[in-house]
Amino acid sequence: MTNISLDKLVTESRNENTKDIDRVETLEMLKMINDEDKKVAEAVEKELIHIAKAVDKIGESFLNGGRLIYVGAGTSGRLGVLDASECPPTYGVSYDLVRGIIAGGESAMFKAREGAEDSKKLCIKDLKNINFGKNDILVGIAASGRTPYVIGGLEYANGIGATTISVTCNPESEMSKIANISIAPVVGPEAITGSTRMKAGTAQKMVLNMLSTGAMVKTGKVYGNLMVDLKATNEKLVERAKRIVMQATGSKREQVEKILKETNFDVKLSIFMIESSLDKIKAKEILDKNKGYIVEAIKEIS
């Protein structure tokens, strides 16, 4: 257990702006919370340089067969699992490429297991269970920057030569000193003292969104701002797939539906077939040669 005193942590400080939150009308209470929330995006903005470095590292790892692994406890762990679980349907990647690990295991997603965060060895065990390797990226998430579970994971990852990234909301935290890249949006004291599921959690969610989205953009999963590798696994996504191809190519619905049927709803391949006027086999060959980057594939045939 780390010996950092809680009274030195920004996230545990008392917020003078909300000290009367229990004595005001509902609307005023919500305005207080909203005013605090407005500070989050600005805090994240100050960390963009560090976030960019992290995105570049993650994208490079993906291209070299590595994975993105989030570890955290409590709210931080849940946010990692949430971000990871959205990557396969959005970008068509395997469930193994981006993974979230929460202290205490799957049951901790639904019921707090606070004691699990106090063990460094538990995180090391969890990482070994997924065969975490030096080509993978470890992102340790903890508002305080002092959670033993996460620190144990970062130390282990450093020890095997993997790239480590910390996402915290306290400046100069222990985690930030251990990680290769430190991302620390300082959002200030919470509206409810110590309730880091609020501003800190929001900041962490924004950062994780940037990390995964940025890496997917860097690895050709996006064309323009369209998610061209999505998996059309339900009616909503089937319709979205059609709209994406229409938006990307300017084609009529009838043509798009025909091409999507031919490609078994491979959105990226459908777009490139229309843009290139190539048949499916040739289009796939060129697309694969260019590692799925539509822009690069189009350049090759121009």
UniProtKB/Swiss-Prot annotation:
User: Which CDD domains does the annotation name?
Assistant: SIS_Etherase
User: Which UniProt keywords are given for this protein, alphabetically ordered?
Assistant: Carbohydrate metabolism, Lyase
Domain SIS, which positions?
A: 58-221
* Catalytic activity, as annotated: N-acetyl-D-muramate 6-phosphate + H2O = N-acetyl-D-glucosamine 6-phosphate + (R)-lactate
Note, other: A lyase-type mechanism (elimination/hydration) is suggested for the cleavage of the lactyl ether bond of MurNAc 6-phosphate, with the formation of an alpha,beta-unsaturated aldehyde intermediate with (E)-stereochemistry, followed by the syn addition of water to give product.
Q: Which family does it belong to?
A: Belongs to the GCKR-like family. MurNAc-6-P etherase subfamily.
The record describes its quaternary structure and partners as: Homodimer.
Q: Which HAMAP family match?
A: MurQ
Q: What is this protein called?
A: N-acetylmuramic acid 6-phosphate etherase
